[in-house]
């Protein structure tokens, strides 16, 4: 389990003239002192529900531990359950898929080969390039169908006749479209049925599906579009959406075993699906299994992207018919998720430590989120003023005792208990395995800190919610100024026409009443490293002219090799050496561990976890400076 976040220490670089040795960071305030939490930090593990197969776990088992796909499946679904791998009696059975983006819409289709036909058409010799089915106005379950030899996706408001489409007739219950090749497993992806998705912006995406695309109504007589495909053809559109096809090339091809295991899990799960009686067995979103079809065009005439992959096609073909059965012979509903954080959730399948998931070390194997008390209370206003957030975990092992069973949100007006899954949903957490740590203000004996100014760029702008949850409880008087592309000094900026006002401009715009006691400058990524020393000097001079007691710079991560941020950091360190009222917070060192790569989206900007961790770093550093008396009014007394 992680230690209390406020107690985690990082390096602070400060001018030698003001360095005070031997002082530890400030003790965090506690509930016993009568303080209420200003925020809550949620530490968690994994991405998804954690039941059954972990996709990243499969990848780790295959590429690091050298396991076969059979071993992977036996680990996640076998063992104490007595489940085993088996063969389907009907491996070519049909899957029917509700295509959710088409809800209440017409069904328009295109054929690259000009061979589209309607299965209900009495004249099966007719072929078209484009067709559209619309429910007849004033009638239920009666479809009017038009066809054209032009390549076109009609909008809902378009007149088919005015667009050159000819009416084929009216058809009861369904309108089902195929091309000459769409039901052939060997067909190229673009020889299948192209479905015109609803207009987004100015474009109609066209998504291609194997098998049949059908217009029909659900039990409430609402328009729906369904794809009917052979099971393995359907899986060719599922497996690459659930696990990256590129995994198959990893570790000299050993990653194929992760894809094979995924194919079997997806197949067994599919066979158990029967969600929408009279309509479809399954859906195309993560509520069921993500299904992308065979190919995609971003507009009707745009260059296509084939969504199927040779690796995942191979994984499906090489495991065809294989599913998981119970000892009694029933097909197992083989749930799976992205990452279990190093331990399966238990339930239908035993709770197991997952060395494969730990080895894969996915970006969401561990994660951090931060929420202010106001954000928590906004979800549960009946509790009044927040006093605590506590979790009850399953006790089956791992951080915080295991997966979260329920969460109690307590306040001055009462408390609310919700399930771990419900809390996860309310706050968009990656998984239901987490623990909650309160964030309090400064200890009551801490020195008073005057008004503060924060000047930041897009990094600073991105942490505004986390700042309110983690920093503001202890430092409430902060003038927070952060915008994209901001630099220290505009004229020497990489993009001088953007990010205005620059740091100098922000400082110069302050009225006398706004002059801060402490200034935090989180800038530099947009500055030219070659002029950084001069830029920093100008900012220091501007702040000194306004009698700022302590000037704090945050140095830069050097992960991005395309810029010489080490030179920028050297300029900041030199400024701290020569200016006794300047401190530099060493974010570069604090974020340099390989495991911290999950904090960055592009080696500069931060992921959601990175935003929480960066803000926590700032809070810890400010607390350390406060303990040393460097941001309180009388540092000489320390």
Walk through the language-model features, giving the residues of each:
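Conserved SGNH/GDSL esterase-like catalytic core that processes O-acyl groups on lipids
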Residues: 449-455, 459-535, 560-566
């Amino acid at each position: 389990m992680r230690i209390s976040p406020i107690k985690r220490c990082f390096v602070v670089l400060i001018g030698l003239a003001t360095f005070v040795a031997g002082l530890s960071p400030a003790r965090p305030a506690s509930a016993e002192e009568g303080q209420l939490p200003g925020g809550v930090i949620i530490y968690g593990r994994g991405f998804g529900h954690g039941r059954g197969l972990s996709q990243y776990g499969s990848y780790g088992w295959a590429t690091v531990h050298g396991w076969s796909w059979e071993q992977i499946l036996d680990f996640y679904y076998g063992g104490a359950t007595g489940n085993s791998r088996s063969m389907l009696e009907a491996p070519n059975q049909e899957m029917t898929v509700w295509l959710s983006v088409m809800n209440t819409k017409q069904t328009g289709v295109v054929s690259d080969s000009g061979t589209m036909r309607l299965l209900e058409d009495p004249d099966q010799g007719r072929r078209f390039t484009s067709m559209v089915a619309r429910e007849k106005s004033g009638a239920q379950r009666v479809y009017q169908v038009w066809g054209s030899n032009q390549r076109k996706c009609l909008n809902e408001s378009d007149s088919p006749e005015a667009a050159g489409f000819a009416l084929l007739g009216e058809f009861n219950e369904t309108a089902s479209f195929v091309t000459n090749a769409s039901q052939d497993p060997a067909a190229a992806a673009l020889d299948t049925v192209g479905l015109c998705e609803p207009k987004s912006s100015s474009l109609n995406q066209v998504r291609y599906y194997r098998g049949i695309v059908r217009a029909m109504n659900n039990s409430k007589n609402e328009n729906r579009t369904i794809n009917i495909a052979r099971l393995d053809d359907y899986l060719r559109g599922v497996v690459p959406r659930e696990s990256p096809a590129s995994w198959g090339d990893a570790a000299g091809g050993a990653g194929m075993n992760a894809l094979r295991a995924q194919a079997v899990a997806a197949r067994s799960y599919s066979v158990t699906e029967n969600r929408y009686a009279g309509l479809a067995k399954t859906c195309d979103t993560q509520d069921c299994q993500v299904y992308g079809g065979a190919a995609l065009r971003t507009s009707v005439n745009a260059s296509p992207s084939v969504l199927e992959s040779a690796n995942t096609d191979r994984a499906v073909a090489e495991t065809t018919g294989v599913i998981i059965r119970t000892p009694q012979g029933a097909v197992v509903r083989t749930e799976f998720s992205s990452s279990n954080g190093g331990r399966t959730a238990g339930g239908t399948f035993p709770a197991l430590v997952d060395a494969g998931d730990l080895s894969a070390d996915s970006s969401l194997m561990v994660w951090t989120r931060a929420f202010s008390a106001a954000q928590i209370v906004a979800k549960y206003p009946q509790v009044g003023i927040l006093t605590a957030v506590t979790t009850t975990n399953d006790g089956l092992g791992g951080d915080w005792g295991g997966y979260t069973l329920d969460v109690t949100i307590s306040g001055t007006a009462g408390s609310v208990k919700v399930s771990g899954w419900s809390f996860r949903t309310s706050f968009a957490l990656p998984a239901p395995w987490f623990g909650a740590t309160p964030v309090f203000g400064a200890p009551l004996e801490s020195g008073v800190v005057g008004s503060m100014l924060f000047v930041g760029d897009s990094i600073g702008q991105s942490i505004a919610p986390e700042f309110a949850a983690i920093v503001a409880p202890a430092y409430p008087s902060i003038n927070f100024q952060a915008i994209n592309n901001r630099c220290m000094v505009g004229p020497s900026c990489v993009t001088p026409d953007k990010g205005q006002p620059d740091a100098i401009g922000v400082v110069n715009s302050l009225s006398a009443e706004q002059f801060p006691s402490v200034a935090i400058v989180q800038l530099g990524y947009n500055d030219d490293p070659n002029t950084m020393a001069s830029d920093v000097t100008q900012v220091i001079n501007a702040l000194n002219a306004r009698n700022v007691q302590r000037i704090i710079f945050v140095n830069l991560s050097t992960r991005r090799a395309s810029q010489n941020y080490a030179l920028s950091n050297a300029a900041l360190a030199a400024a701290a050496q020569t200016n006794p009222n300047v401190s530099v917070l060493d974010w570069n060192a604090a974020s340099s561990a390989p495991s911290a790569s999950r904090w960055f989206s592009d080696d500069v900007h931060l992921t959601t976890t990175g935003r929480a961790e960066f803000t926590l770093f700032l809070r810890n550093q400010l607390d350390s400076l406060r303990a040393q008396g460097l941001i309180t009014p009388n540092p000489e007394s320390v």
